Swiss-Prot record:
Record InterPro entries: Aldolase_II/adducin_N (IPR001303), Aldolase_II/adducin_N_sf (IPR036409), Enolase-ppase_E1 (IPR023943), HAD-like_sf (IPR036412), HAD_sf (IPR023214), MethylthioRu-1-P_deHdtase_MtnB (IPR017714), MtnB_viridiplantae (IPR027505), Salvage_MtnB_euk (IPR027514)
Binding site for substrate 1: 114
Cofactor binding, note field: Binds 1 zinc ion per subunit.
Positions bound to Mg(2+): 281, 283, 476
Gene Ontology CC annotations of this record: cytoplasm
A Gene Ontology biological process term: L-methionine salvage from methylthioadenosine
Family according to the record: In the N-terminal section; belongs to the aldolase class II family. MtnB subfamily. In the C-terminal section; belongs to the HAD-like hydrolase superfamily. MasA/MtnC family.
Binding site for Zn(2+): 132, 134, 207
Protein name: Probable bifunctional methylthioribulose-1-phosphate dehydratase/enolase-phosphatase E1
Pathway(s) it belongs to: Amino-acid biosynthesis; L-methionine biosynthesis via salvage pathway; L-methionine from S-methyl-5-thio-alpha-D-ribose 1-phosphate: step 2/6; Amino-acid biosynthesis; L-methionine biosynthesis via salvage pathway; L-methionine from S-methyl-5-thio-alpha-D-ribose 1-phosphate: step 3/6; Amino-acid biosynthesis; L-methionine biosynthesis via salvage pathway; L-methionine from S-methyl-5-thio-alpha-D-ribose 1-phosphate: step 4/6
Annotated region described as Enolase-phosphatase E1, given as residue ranges: 278-517
Binding site for substrate 2: 416-417, 450
Length: 517
């Protein structure tokens, strides 16, 4: 089929033979996209020529990454779509075949404006198909909280239809802001895909949703589940039911019942009257555990060799290696699983790095809270943030709370197992912007083990309060709560999706959002 002039990235190329383009696999893919367009039009997802669909040609003889791409055009009535309307592209997005122009009143053929966004899903996630829907529920769900950067839901049966999720899991869909032109969304969608490795969809506020899957069946199934869940969210909102918690109780019920809340502070977020300082844990308190385990830890693990190799002779890395050697020698004496000897420097750079990588990978796998590991991770993450390969994630109630505490004159500090540098990087590069202006200081394991009472005494001495009771500590870890309480801190335990269960009769006040404080 000859090209009739297309506005996509590249002109028609000759990288695939005419015979293959006219062959059975490509023909079936064209017909499939046309059929899906008609089906989704009936669903209300692609009305008014909006929305688009693309699939990879199903040819088992060709690796998925190299398969041709079939993509629906722009400006064509989806309910009247036929196979001949489709564009066929190479795996890199180069157009190989374009539709023939039709007589007036049909518009000249034009490749979908979604093409660069579709290519991001193909290249970054190895997708087999991508669906862009303008379904009403995908727009309204993003309007319920105009400031939210994520959509969250848990304990709904249809969550099981989303890849990698179960009934009890928390579904998280990143939300990016709309732009006047579709192609202008490319960078923000790319950043969201990178920041949320478990996600198979991105919502565009007041616009729609992009959904991808390993195959057209998987993408279609997930798209149907997403639309169901977003529609359920809207209906639950109308009923005053909270879709973000396992109990699905009344929205803000806890907030309404607590007399501690102040009408002067929007959304609560006011510390107890006696508190002069708030000390926050990160993982499971300000930030989802999944972000740390699924993004931060894997990034450090996957980049430790490159980091050590490229910075081996720097003073900073020499110090990191010195601390690791001391820790590993101690681990070997104590029979710690996964510890392997580190050869002397005379053995050569490569041998030293190989042994260090093996030890670090073992430490990360065991989630050890030790200073040498945390310091090295912080230096690796710094590079990730500088390269924009990492972006900090916090729960949506956190920025509001930090701002309100700051406005009320309450000083806020962080106490985390991660290094102080890593803490600053995370809060300085969040999806909500730089939050460090609301923080007064940072504590890490150099202050002491977070499960030991002595550590909280050291924190209280550093903060200069008259009494430890003037410090409110919020954490998700029971043992940390006990240690802080034994020092005299006021303590609240954070209940977030994915956090470890608490023992029965633990005796601590719990919250699911900072808005309850």
């Amino acid at each position: 089929m000859a090209c009739g002039g297309c506005s996509c990235e590249a002109a028609v190329g000759a990288t695939a033979s005419e015979a293959y383009l006219e062959g059975e696999p490509v023909r079936e893919a064209r017909e499939l996209v046309a059929e899906l367009c008609r089906h989704f039009y009936a669903q209300g997802w692609v009305t008014g020529t909006g929305g688009s669909i693309t699939v990879k040609v199903n040819d088992p003889a060709v690796p998925l990454a190299d398969r041709l791409i079939v993509m629906s055009p722009s400006g064509v009535q989806k309910e009247r779509m036929v196979a001949e309307d489709m564009y066929v592209m190479a795996a890199d997005g180069k157009v190989l075949s374009a539709p023939v122009a039709k007589p007036w009143p049909n518009k000249p053929p034009k490749c979908t404006d979604c093409a660069p966004l579709f290519m991001k899903a193909y290249l970054m996630r190895g997708a087999g198909a991508v669906i862009h829907s303008h379904g009403m529920e995908t727009c309204i769900a993003t309007m319920l909280n105009p400031g939210a950067k994520e959509f969250r839901m848990t304990h709904m049966e249809m969550i099981k239809g989303i890849k990698g999720h179960g009934y009890r899991d928390e579904l998280v869909i990143p939300i990016v802001e709309n732009t006047p032109y579709e192609y202008e969304l490319t960078d923000s969608l790319s950043e969201a895909i990178a920041a949320y490795p478990k996600a198979t969809a991105v919502l565009v506020r007041n616009h729609g949703i992009y959904v991808w899957g390993d195959s057209w069946i998987n993408a279609k199934t997930q798209a149907e589940c997403y639309h169901y869940l977003l529609d359920a969210c809207i209906k639950l909102y109308q009923l005053g039911i909270d879709w973000t918690t396992p109990e699905h109780g009344p929205i803000n019920n806890a907030k309404r019942q607590r007399s501690i809340l102040s009408s002067e502070i929007p959304n609560g977020c006011r510390a107890a009257d006696s508190s002069k300082c708030v000390v926050l844990d990160i993982e499971g308190t300000t930030t989802p555990i999944s972000f740390v385990t699924d993004v931060m830890f894997p990034y450090a693990r996957d980049n430790v060799r490159e980091h050590l190799t490229s910075t081996f002779d720097s003073e900073e890395t020499k110090d990191d290696i010195k601390l690791l050697r001391i820790q590993i020698e101690d681990d070997l004496r104590n029979g710690i699983s996964g510890a392997v000897p580190v050869p002397p420097d005379e053995a050569g750079k490569e041998e030293v790095i190989n042994s260090l990588v093996a030890n670090v990978e073992s430490m990360i796998k065991a989630d050890r809270k030790i200073t040498p590991l945390k310091q090295l991770q912080g230096h690796i993450w710094r590079t990730g943030f500088e390269k924009k390969e990492l972006q900090g994630v916090v729960f949506e109630d956190v920025p509001v709370a930090l701002k309100n505490w700051h406005s009320s004159g309450i000083k806020v500090y962080i106490y985390s197992s991660g290094s102080r540098e890593a803490q600053r990087l995370l809060f300085g590069n969040t999806t909500y912007g730089d939050l460090r202006k609301f923080l007064c200081g940072y504590f890490d394991t150099t202050t002491g083990n977070k499960r030991e009472t002595r550590s909280y005494f050291e924190v209280s001495q550093s903060l200069g309060v008259d009494s430890p009771s003037q410090i409110l500590f919020i954490t998700d870890v029971f043992q940390e709560a006990v240690a802080a309480k034994n020092t005299g801190f006021e303590v609240i335990i954070s209940i977030r999706p994915g956090n470890a269960p608490l023992p029965d009769n633990h005796g601590f006040r719990t919250i699911k959002s900072f808005s309850e404080i």
